[in-house]
Every structure is written in structure tokens, then in C-alpha cells.
Amino acid sequence: MAERVSLVFHNKMIDGTAIKRLISRLIDHFGMAYTSHILDQVKTLGFQQATATSISLGIDDLLTIPSKRWLVQDAEQQSFILEKHYHYGNVHAIEKLRQSIEIWYATSEYLRQEMNPNFRMTEPFNPVHIMSFSGARGNASQVHQLVGMRGLMSDPQGQMIDLPIQSNLREGLSLTEYIISCYGARKGVVDTAVRTSDAGYLTRRLVEVVQHIIVRRTDCGTVRGISVSPQNQNRMMSERVFSQTLIGRVLADDIYMGQRSIAIRNQDIGIGLVNRLITLRTQAISIRTPFTCRSTSWICRLCYGRSPTHGDLVELGEAVGIIAGQSIGEPGTQLTLRTFHTGGVFTGGTAEHVRAPSNGKIKFNEDLVHPTRTRHGHPAFLCSIDLDVIIEGEDIMHNVTIPPKSFLLVQNDQYVESEQVIAEIRAGAYTLNFKERVRKHIYSDSEGEMHWSTDVYHAPEFTYSNVHLLPKTSHLWILSGGSRRSSVVSFSLHKDQDQMNIHSLSVERREISSLSLSVNNDQTGHKFFSSDFSAKKKGRILEMSDYSGFNRIISTGHCNLIHPAILHANSDLLAKRQRNGFLIPFHSIQEQEKELMPHSGISIEIPVRGIFRRNSILAYFDDPRYRRKSSGITKWGTLGAHSIVKKEDLIEYRGLKKIKPKYQMKIDRLFFIPEEVHIFPESSYLMVRNNSIIGVDTQITLNIRSRVGGLVRMERKRGGVELKIFSGDIHFPGEIDKISRHSGILIPPESEKTKLKEATKESKKLKKWIYVQRITPTKKKSFVLVRPVVTYEIANGINLATLFPQDPLREKDNMQFRVVNYVLYGKGKAAGGISDTSLQLVRTCLVLNWDQDNKSSSVEEVCASFVEVRTNGLIRNFLRINLVKSNISYLRKRDHPSGSGLISDNGSARTNSNPFYSVFGKAGVEQSLRQNQGTIRTLLNKNKECQVLIILSSSNYFRMGPLNDVKYHNVIKQSIPIQKDSLTPIKTSLGPLGTFLQIANFYSFYYLITHNHISVTKYLKLDNLKQPFQVLKYYLMDETGEIYNPDTDSKILLNPFNLNWYFLQPNYCEEMSPIISLGQFLCENVRITKRGPYLKSGQVLIVQVNSVVIRSAKPYLATPGATVHGHYGAILYEGDTLVTFIYEKSRSGDITQGLPKVEQVLEVRSLDSISMNLEKRVEGWNASITRILGIPWGFLIGAELTIVQSRISLVNKIQKVYRSQGVQIHNRHIEIIVRQITSKVLVSEDGMSNIFLPGELIGLLRAERMGRALEEVICYRAILLGITRASLNTQSFISEASFQETTRVLAKAALRGRIDWLKGLKENVVLGGIIPVGTGFKGLVHCSRQHNNILLERQKGNLFGGEMRDIFLHHRELFDSCISTTFHDTSEHNCLEGLMSPRSEFF
């Protein structure tokens, strides 16, 4: 007790570190038992004092920070502004993410700093404050989450979730915030489930690789070592890391201090020796590691070093491989449960700022900086060297030096206020270790077409793919528009650039009742579907054999045609969509009330785009004389017929082509044999029998009666019964062969009596034609049915007079019309309608043609449009047909590999490749197209085949206007000389994207100069022109051309041959408002005129005199180096990958991010998303070594150096991840694993070797030994195997088969005749033998051969020096022949100087 006076009294606060130090010293001095007694006393003292102070923790002790509300509001405001910038396309997704994270991180940090002063001011003895800030329990981060805000969280992949948790745990979390918390918090629900399995599998693979590694010898006799130096050129190795690396190792060489030896070779290093080495600051120390052990499948005691359990050299028979695998895998399993209670809360760093010392004007040298973008997307200047910035105040000048690689955020001569941020210093080099390069994919928010506003290069390795690299900052645009993917059964109403009407045909998948099947399905290949009309009359369908369906009335207006011969007075315009165009029948109102779609009257057939080819049918007329109310069979006498097949009638369905011909008559008679047809479902109850004879008005079913009498024939057809009633006379002739000779023939009147006698046994003359048909009932005698025949006389087709007068400029190009009759049904085919619908047999067509004499004419097509002319209050509608010289061609903006260079309109490119054939298969018609007005564009893929329809609907347009202050000056008004009696033709203006408007939308307002004048004498005057329908007036040019919409009075120069629009160049406006060019892309919030509206982002589609129409588009900013997916003009769907950025982000300090990294390194996956040319560097190094040393040495040394370097860097990478988590793993465990995955080489084809096959994987040591034994050069190169591949490339096939791919491994082993020597643990466990470790280890070990110790003076070598020298020693004989017989230090030194420049340190 007397010694107490001499004890030193410390009055200090003890934290955790000090307690640890105290305990360790107590144990050293007093031992374990006494120390535990002391610690008990300390614990009791603490509890006593806590009770005396009455510290308790209640929820009221958690005081929230008052400034939190406005701090969060401020951050939200900044986030909102950032979101708007992103929407406008000013920043891209990465910059937005970075800035968002930094905004919230700064807010969270500021709150954390406010916390301590807040406690101190309000309640200094708050228990939370006392506990956390004294370091007794908890830390600032946890208290911050309790009373500040939880802030940003990391997800299981370690990615930042940019939605911060604004609440703290005192206030409670919302549902979304709680779910985000589940990702992070300790034992997080999401995390534990996902991660534990990963860590377990990692451990399994690691153990699999190294399970056979056992300590089998004391010394392998190696002379190699790895040098470890406490100081390095780059940076000092910390003492802790240095001592950890050395303790427990064995020296590979003696250590000298001057002349005196401090330690000798093969001595194990303890803590005392390490301390002496650190104190003496010796040079590099060479140590033995598992890498230097000369064995292949085991390890020796000296290369392994001390056992981690009892601190002595490892025992023989120790299973060090399994220990190593578990040492690396186990921390992963533990650390998945995030040891710290901070719970995945993000920690990062913000950049350092330079602020202005006072108010003043900025001055700096602009030549030393160049403009750039900061990582948040703000404009800035980057200075490459030290930059002096002068701030000129009123009375003082400040000089601020900005370090290199910093961002200057202000401009020259800008006025700054005091404390304003003027520069941002780039984070120092030390933070670079915590950065990693990652990929970020940006996905499209909407569907539409992709465009970009700059050139894009193909990525070199993907020359033929759709991956492009951006050379400079630009916008990617997604132009909105709905799309429908085409399928086998699709509906070809539309071609490229067509307009769709609101009422255009929408075909939907419908179930078709059996009543709506028609008899002539087989003939036409169509299947009819119920339209809106037939729904009103249940069970009936309108029988139109070649129509695809009905449409609503588009508009009603009185229409007349040009030619008076085909004029039909008082008719209404009812239009119907057909596959190849519009159908506009002219019919009287009375008929319209009787029937929905009359069969008489003139129908004009106009293609969808108003363009006719040669021999197109312009109009047709259904003559009432050729109409029948009943079904029947058509026949004709074949004087000659050829079928007209139109392009559009070719129907393709799953590769089958059905051609529906229209038979053009050269005959004068058509015969129609009537019959009554009914189709019933199979379940119907029929009251008549097959082959029975019934009278008129006989009841067939409960509610159907026959209209004619005659013979009943029934036939089963696809799910129903077809019942036919043949009227006529029945005869029973005597001789069967005479019947068969005359069966199925038409017999004319006035024929010979004898012939008739045989057939009919009647002698009186016939007044009409008859049809003889033989009927054979099943059991009864055959008889002949003589059926009445209706005959029709048909007039031949005639050519109408040419409508146009001879044109002085081009005499040949004139319109001609031909009247053609054709029969709608084939010869002998059944033409039938159900119940009482009527049937048209013959149709009269008006065929359009021109310049038949001149084959070389360039006019391929004509355009049709309607013109309305008013004379004296009477309105006449004319169909106007324009000749178009040459093809209309659409050029895309850029001839891109994907794009459709030039698509001609005359059929070849488009018609043949258009998959939108009209097909009505058994499943009905696919899906409806859009039912709203829009422009259709067909997008082409690489092979110029159509893939997708894109539909621009009205919802994708914005109409902005009016722009009052856009003025046009000096427009030249050119007048056309107009005679009083002449009519200037009026051209329908072009619609969006160079298309013709459909009939419902055509208009005509401007006068055009054309070459064809049509003279209509004394018919009307020019002033009375008016547009029939009120629609937008607009003009459109190609994306680069200029746009100019003239006044209503001015004239437009139009070249009708190629449809390029030439506008008179307008002078610019007096105001500085720009003239918008068509196809131009505008970002949102841009004002095109001073007082104009703010535009939405999009592409200028239509420019009018006082308004502009913009197709809405979404801009995405992309910076150089980004990868763009997809082609220019390609279609993207929502969620498709649009662009990939590669950026650096700071690593999150958490093991859950570490585990994937460890796995990546061990599985040897590429760490960076884009290889940093590492492979090329290794290849170049190998090539240069080969060049210097020749072939044999080059491969040998190149492979060895590659392996040594890669081993060291792998160990360092894995250690870095674990150390960042505070997990201490001894290097030797990692080295054993890394040795296994780097111990194989790949035999290459460069040298012809008779020992191994090219591409074979062999052990490095085996390759060296074989080369030495056979004195033959084996060429090989180093290869890194991942742990999975290494497990499947061992010497034991039983071990491989028990890991993965059992069948494949065993089959290969059987084919190769492999032998398993059962050296490892696993194969013995599988077969139930004694495992060769511990007590089962066979002590019969051969004495290692004593190597001649070659004493050489050690160089102060770095790693490469030591390694290279050892390589040379191993291959002495070869080396002698290569260089010289004497091996001097100098020669070695000189030889190595050139190669050994890079240094490496190892820890």
C-alpha cells in the first residue's frame, strides 16, 4: 500500500481505444484472472454512478432540431429545380443523380452538425447527449437518425436510392420510407435474405478450390522470396500493415545491418523482430510466401509460416487450404448482417469550395482555362495549372490562387459578392481509391421514334450493331407516337406516310357467329366480320364479296363527277375504307333509306394516298339489271377471258398466296342458274329431308319458309348445315350413260329435237336456255334435274374520249378512261347470299390509263383529289386527277445504315416488303389500329422491310399560336395570266411529312402554277373557289430546309415533277425573333418570339402564318463517351434502353458492396464496365519481352512476370475490400486461394510442341519441368481462372464432379481415362476413406533434396529483381546458351535494368 503514493493520477476521459489499451497492458502485467477482477470493479463503479445520476432514456429525451423544417424545404426546392432542368434536357440522368445525392447529403450533414449545439443550448444533461457525445454508447450517426433525418440509403447492390428518408425515427417513417429502410437497416429484411446465400456460396467455392492443400513437407528448398519494404517511392506503408504482413512469416534471406546479420534465412518473424526492423528502417525484406513454394498440390511449413492458432510453425498434416477458404468466406457471412447500427445510411463526401473574400469584379487570364461541364452539368472553366484570380473590390484587391484541375464557376469581369462560391477544388488524390467506374443505363419513358442532334460514331467493336458512341454532348430525342407491332395477321389499310381519319376502319378481334359465314368464303379467301351496321340487324351480314367492312359516314356533301356520262344526280357522299383506298358510292337518298349500302350507283374508288397507278380502277357502276335477289351459279360461254389481277388483290396468309381474279369479258352472255340457299347451325331442327321435293312456302324450320319449290339438297359444312333448294323439272331417263354425257351442261333454245328428246323426253321446243344436272341419291335411282337459266347480255368495254385537251408541252401524257365489265364470280362457282340479301353479278368499271402509246413516259402515277367549285350559288364537286412526273421519293434525314435511304413510291421497295397485308384468317382480324386522327409512318429495319407502324395521334401534337410578331417582307407576288374561260387547276396541299391528306381533310386554297391547263368553257369563274372542309393550312419541308408560309394572296412556285417545294426567300424580321425551320427540335421553355408563348419540347411539324405545330418529344441529354442503343429513326418502346453512361462514383463503405467486389476479383470478372486496355498492355509487354530475349525466354519470363504481378494485385484488391470493413484477414489465406487460380497456363499455338495440345490448361510448374526434361520449348501464356473454373480444373475428377456439372465431368474423365490419386480431402470423404490430414496424415515424407545453396550477393531488389533472378537460376542451362557461360552480377544487373523499371509493393 505504500507504493500508492508513487502512482500517477490521470484525470482523463477514457474512450473505447484507451480501455482496450489499458486491458492489454493489465493482462501483460497481471494475467487474465486478476484483470477480469479489475474490470468487474470498473463495471460496478459505472452502474453506481449512473444510478446516482438517475440517467434514464425516455422518448421525450429525443429532442428534434428546430431548423430541420426549412432545411428540408430548401433541399426540396433545389430538387424541384433540378427535376425541371432534367425535363428540359439541360442535365442528364447521372448529373441529376449526383446533384440530388449531394443536395440531400449536405442537408443531412448540416442537420448533424446542428445537433450537438442544439443539445448543448437546450438541455446539456440530456441522457442521449451524455451517452452519445461522451462515446459511452452510440455514436453521432445513430443519434442523428433518431432526432435529425435518416437521409439517403443504399440498396442491396450498394447503389444509392435517390429518394431520401426525410423523417427521423422519433417522428416515425411513412410507408415508402419504411420500405426503403428495410433495404438498409441491420438484419434488414431484404438484405439478410439476399446476402447470406451469396456469402455461403462464396465460402463453398473457395473451399472447393483449395481443399486439397495440406502441409506435407518442412522445406521445399525454394530460393525465391517476395520483398516487402516499409518505405516506398509512392507512399509510406503504415506500421500496422507492415507488421501484419511480416508477423508469422519466414525469412527467405538473411537480413544485414551494415556488416552485421540481424536475422537469418528460414527464421520465423515474431513481434520483437518486426519492432527492431521498423526501428532500424532496414531496406526491403525478402520473405517466403505460398506463392514461392515449389510444390504444386501442397505446401511446406516454411512457406506457410506460423499457424494462426498457437503461434508456432504450422504442423505437418494441417489442412491449411480449408482454413484459408473459410477465413475469407466466413467474414462475408457475418458481415452481411451489417454489424453497425448505422444501417446502410449513405456516407460520402462533398467537394471543397473556394469563396470570394469580398465583393468585387473577377479578373483572370482566359487563355489558361477552357470551358467544360461540372459533374452536376453546370457550365464552368477548367484550369490545368495554378490560376491566379484577382478580385477587384472598391478599395482593395484580393488575389486567390486556384489549384490545377479545379473548376472555376464564374466568368471573367463578373461581379461577385462576398462569400460567393467562385471555384470548386477537385477532391484530392486520396479519394480516388474510393471511386469506381460503373455503368448506368437510361431507359426511355415513352414510346416513339429516336432522333439525335449530332453525328454518332459506331463503337469500334460493334461495327454492325446498333451501339453508337457519342463524340460530343448532344440531345437524344424520343418523338412521341403510339405504335403497333406488326404480326402475321395484320391489317393493311395504311401505307407509309398515310393520314388516318378518326373514323377510319378499326377492326377488332370479334367472335364470328355461324350465321355470318358466307357461301363464297372458299372462293374469296375472306372471312366477313360483323360491322357496326350488322349489329343493328341481328344475324344478318351485308354480303359484299370483296369489301373488308363498313365505315361510318364521313361527310355528306353533293358530289358530281367530271364526265357527264357517269353523272348521278342528287347523290350523297358516303365513303367506305377498303384495303386499297376509299370507296365513295354515289346513290340517291331513297335507296339509302331502303338499304344501308346500295349496289347500284357509281362508286369512286380512291387509294388512301390519292395516287393511282396505270390501269387502276377509278370508279365502278353496279347495274341493277345484273342484280339477283337469290343465290345461284354463274356460267358463261368461253369466247375468251383474261383475268385482271390488281396488286392489292394479292392476299398473303402465312406464306400461302390466294389470288382473287376479276374476269374481264370478251363474251356477250352470262348465265345465272338460281337456287335458294340456307345455312343452319348443326343444332337446328330441320323439318325437311335430304333429296325430298317440296313446294313453295314450305316450312323448313320453325321460323323459315322456302321461297321456291323444288328438290332439297343438304350438305354439311364447317360447323353447320347448308340447305339448297333447286327449282326445276325432274326427269327419269332410261339410259344412265346418256345422262352422264349431258350432265352439268347448258342447252340453248331452238336445238335439235333428237338431242333434246334423249335428255328430256319432250318434243316441244324450248323458249329459254336450260341447265341439265344429274342427281344421284344414295339408294334411289338417278334422275336428271332440268333447271331454269337466267341469261344476261353484256356489252363490251369501250374507251371513253380523252378528258384532257392536248397539252402543248407534253402531248403524250394524257388521261384515258376505259369502261370495262367484269364478272364478280368465277365460272361454275357458287355465288350466294344468305336469306334475302341481293347479289351483283356484273360490275362496270372505269379504268384509268394514260399515254398507252409511249412506253418510255416517266409518269408512273397520278394524284386524285376533290375540288369544290361554286357557281352562282350552286356547288359542284369535281374529282381532279393530276399527273405526277417521276416518283415521289422520301429521303430520310441521314442515310444511316439502319435507315431507308431512298424509298421509291412506284412499288418496288415498298409494296414487296410491306408485311401489312390484308388478311382475314380464321381467327378474325388482329387488333384495331388507332381510332383517332393521325399520320402513319412505316419504319424500316436494316433490310428495308417494314416492321412497325407508328401512328401520330392528335394527342401528340401541341398547337402553339398565334405568333403575331413574325413578319414577312418583300414577298414577290407573281400573277398567273388567267383567261376568262380557263380554269386554273387547284392542287391539294401536302399534309404533314409530305403526304396527301385524305379525302375528308383535303382542302384547296392556294393557286399553283402547273403545266396542265384544263379548259372548261363558260362554266365558272376563278373567284368562286372555296375549300370544302375547314382544316389546318400548313406546308412542310424536309428537316434541313427552310420553311415559309406565304400570305393568302401570294403564289407558290411548285415544280410538279419532283414535289420539292421551293419558297421565295423571305427577309428576316425586324425583330430578332428567329424563323423556325421545319423539323427543328425545340427544348421546353424556349420562346421563339419576344411576346410569344413558352413552347413545349418537340419537333416543329407545321408552321403556319400565325401559329406553329410541334410534335411533342422528350429530350435526353447525353455527354461524350456515352453509348447510344438503337438506330436513328428507330422505334423505341417504353422501358427500352436508350443510352448507357459510364461514370465514376464514390464507393459506399459497406461490406455488402464489398462482397460482390470480392466475388468479382475471385471469379476474375472485369471490374470496369469498359476494359481499360489492360489486356493490350500485357500483350504488348509479352511481345516486347519476346523481342528482347527471343522466343523461349520470352514466353517463359513473360508468363512468369504476368503471373507474379497479377497475384500481387489480386491479393491487394481483396485485402482492400476487407480492410475497408475493418476485417483483418491474414495475407497468407488470400495467397493460398490466389495461388490456385493463377497456377495454370494455356498452351499457345505459337511454338509447335509435341507434348501438349494447343489450348490445353496445364500447371505452370509442370510446364516448366516438362520443358526442362525434354529440352523442348513449350509456348504458353498466363491465364487467370475464376474460382469456379479452377474448381473444375483440378487433378481430381471426383472432386470436380461433386462440385458442379457432375455428368459432364464424369463423362469426360471416362473418355480420357483419367486416374484419381485421391490426394485431396474431398475425394476421400466421397469414397469413405481416411482423409490425409491430422492423424490420417502419412508421415512417410521423402527427405527433400538438398539444393546447392548458390550464394549470391542480394540486390536491393524490388519484387521484379528478386523474381527475375530466380527465374534465371531455374533455367541456368538455357540461359547459358542464350547469353554467356559466365554469370556475373554485372551481366545480370545490365540485363535486368531495361526490364525492371516498374516497382511494386506488396502488403
Curated annotation (Swiss-Prot):
GO terms for biological process: DNA-templated transcription. The keyword Transferase applies. This is DNA-directed RNA polymerase subunit beta''. One of its GO terms (cellular component) is mitochondrion. DNA-dependent RNA polymerase catalyzes the transcription of DNA into RNA using the four ribonucleoside triphosphates as substrates. Its main location: plastid. Transmembrane segments: none annotated. Binds 1 Zn(2+) ion per subunit. Pfam families: RNA_pol_Rpb1_4, RNA_pol_Rpb1_5. Its cofactor is Zn(2+). InterPro entries: DNA-dir_RpoC2_beta_pp (IPR012756), RNA_pol_beta''_euk (IPR050254), RNA_pol_Rpb1_3_sf (IPR042102), RNA_pol_Rpb1_4 (IPR007083), RNA_pol_Rpb1_5 (IPR007081), Rpb1_funnel_sf (IPR038120). Belongs to the RNA polymerase beta' chain family. RpoC2 subfamily. One of its GO terms (molecular function) is zinc ion binding. It is found in: Plastid, Chloroplast. In plastids the minimal PEP RNA polymerase catalytic core is composed of four subunits: alpha, beta, beta', and beta''. When a (nuclear-encoded) sigma factor is associated with the core the holoenzyme is formed, which can initiate transcription. The gene is rpoC2. It catalyses: RNA(n) + a ribonucleoside 5'-triphosphate = RNA(n+1) + diphosphate. Zn(2+) binds at residues 220, 293, 300, 303. Keywords: Chloroplast, DNA-directed RNA polymerase, Metal-binding, Nucleotidyltransferase, Plastid, Transcription, Transferase, Zinc. Its EC number is 2.7.7.6.
